[in-house]
């Protein structure tokens, strides 16, 4: 077959290709390109690296854990956690020097709050000017003298033994509000003086603060000491020697403030926390205090050491109280969910059996006898107040009350007024609920625009109707009074 004849265009194209090839050959372009290409490939081969991933370790398969409660597994809960979180628990502050003041305008000094195994001078632990400490000592001695002269028995106005009415006459005046100490208040007491209004509080930092409500000079009437290095859990004022006062703390110390000696004497020291203290009205030489896991000790002031120790509860005792008409009858409340009534004449070291026990679903923060001793009121974290009546306190009435204060507010503790008619307890709406024992319900709430925080701990003046002190977790104290 004859070859196909090329067109003019194809012949011209082939001639151009041939001519270009000759030009490139004369310039040695192809050899140069080949050399460069070979060099580049060689360089890439030398520098190219590969990241080798390490072999992954084969993890063993973790078993799937199904969380089940102790109750569903039939296991008894730990006694330390059975009552929930510890009431008023707070970490002990560092035992180093720290500056604490009761008000922004008050000059303060640094106080060493370390544990002193011995007496402490009031002057050394005073938070403020030394001249103010001297003034407080003089004030306290005058308060004590007034208490001894008045006798301190019964209510003013001949109201003793009668039902006290007129709660609507109670009011909170603007001048009866003060920030006494910094931080949360755990304990509050009104001095049993008929001629002077004095309130003492203890806070979580180990401060003991005094408020002279009737102070009229340039001072604010507030005096703060730091005899302890941990939360002050209890205060007992001697009824006929108000210049003497016991305080206890979570660090296991009990101190006796003696204003005449101007000292905080060390009455007792132990390894366990002390949660509450109390004293019988007819025995000023003995002090009852709860320590550690349900232990109740009796401190003898004549020997300066404990004389008896009883294991009454499974875990901490939150309150101790005596029947005013029969001081052999004692009531205790505990985080184990019970409140018990004891006859001290029948309690022995190896066998402590309660006369009566009332059970709650959660921790019981308080159990107090009424002024006549015929009713026992308990306050529990299970949102209830129980009233025990009858010859053997066998009749139990339950009143619902919201007692959930949360972590930052001290637990509510219902206290008695000046007769058996009412129980006073704080609420979460910045008021004070009044519980009627006759109607078994809240019949009134004390409110005031002066209340800026939740009052949670209370005490009443034993001889003045209508005088109620309420303390907050911010260091404030409110003092209600009656116009009648």
Segments predicted by a language model, with ranges:
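Intrinsically disordered terminal extensions that flank WD40 beta-propeller domains
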Residues: 2-185, 484
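Per-blade loop-tip surfaces of WD-repeat and WD-like beta-propellers in eukaryotic adaptors/scaffolds
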Residues: 169-171, 207-223, 240-242, 249-276, ...
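Beta-strand-rich domains and repeat architectures in extracellular enzymes and scaffolds
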Residues: 177-206
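Canonical WD40 repeat/beta-propeller blade segments in eukaryotic WD-repeat proteins
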Residues: 183-190, 230-237, 272-280, 315-322, ...
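Loop/turn segments within WD40 beta-propeller blades
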Residues: 189-196, 236-242, 248, 278-284, ...
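Conserved strand-to-loop turn within each blade of WD40 beta-propeller repeats
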Residues: 202-205, 248-251, 290-293, 333-336, ...
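Loop/turn-rich, solvent-exposed surfaces of beta-rich toroidal or solenoidal domains
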Residues: 370-375, 379-387, 394, 402-437
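C-terminal interaction modules of eukaryotic adaptor/scaffold proteins
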Residues: 432-484
């Amino acid at each position: 077959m004859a070859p196909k004849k090329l067109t003019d265009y194809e012949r011209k194209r082939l001639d151009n290709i041939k001519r270009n090839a000759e030009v490139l050959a004369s310039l040695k372009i192809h050899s140069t390109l080949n050399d460069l290409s070979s060099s580049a490939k060689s360089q890439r081969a030398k520098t190219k690296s590969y990241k080798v991933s390490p072999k992954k370790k084969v993890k063993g398969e973790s078993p799937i854990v199904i969380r089940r409660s102790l109750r569903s597994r039939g296991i008894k809960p730990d006694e330390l956690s059975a009552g929930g979180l510890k009431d008023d628990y707070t970490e002990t502050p560092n035992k180093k020097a720290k500056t604490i003041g009761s008000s922004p305008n008050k000059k303060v000094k640094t106080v060493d709050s370390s544990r002193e195994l011995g007496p402490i001078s009031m002057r050394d632990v005073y938070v403020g000017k030394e001249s103010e400490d001297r003034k407080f000592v003089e004030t306290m001695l005058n308060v004590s003298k007034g208490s001894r002269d008045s006798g301190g028995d019964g209510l003013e106005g001949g109201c003793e033994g009668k039902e006290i009415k007129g709660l609507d006459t109670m009011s909170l005046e603007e001048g009866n509000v003060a920030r006494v100490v910094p931080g949360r208040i755990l304990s509050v007491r009104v001095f049993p003086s008929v001629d002077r209004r004095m309130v003492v509080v203890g806070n979580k930092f180990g401060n003991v603060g005094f408020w002279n409500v009737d102070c009229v000079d340039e001072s604010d009437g507030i005096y703060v000491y730091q005899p302890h290095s941990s939360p002050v859990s209890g205060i007992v004022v001697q009824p006929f020697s108000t210049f003497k006062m016991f305080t206890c703390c979570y660090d296991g110390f009990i101190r006796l403030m003696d204003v005449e000696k101007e000292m905080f004497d060390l009455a007792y020291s132990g390894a366990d926390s002390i949660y509450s203290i109390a004293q019988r009205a007819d025995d000023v030489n003995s002090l009852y205090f709860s320590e550690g896991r349900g232990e109740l000790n009796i401190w003898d002031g004549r020997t300066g050491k404990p004389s008896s120790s009883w294991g009454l509860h499974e875990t901490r005792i939150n309150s101790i109280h005596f029947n005013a008409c029969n001081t052999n009858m004692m009531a205790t409340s505990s985080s184990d969910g019970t409140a018990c009534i004891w006859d001290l004449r029948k309690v022995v070291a190896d066998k402590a059996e309660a006369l009566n026990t009332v059970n709650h679903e959660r921790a019981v923060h308080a159990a107090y006898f009424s002024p006549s001793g015929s009713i026992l009121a308990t306050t529990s974290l299970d949102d209830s107040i129980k009233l025990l009546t009858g010859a053997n306190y066998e009749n139990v009435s339950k009143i619902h009350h919201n007692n959930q204060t949360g972590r930052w507010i001290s637990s509510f503790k219902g206290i008695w007024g000046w007769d058996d008619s009412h129980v006073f307890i704080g609420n979460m709406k910045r008021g004070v609920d009044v519980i009627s024992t006759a109607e078994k319900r809240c019949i009134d709430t004390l409110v005031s625009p002066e209340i800026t925080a939740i009052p949670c701990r209370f005490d009443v003046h034993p001889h003045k109707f209508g005088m109620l002190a309420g303390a907050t977790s911010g260091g404030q104290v409110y003092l209600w009074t009656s116009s009648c």
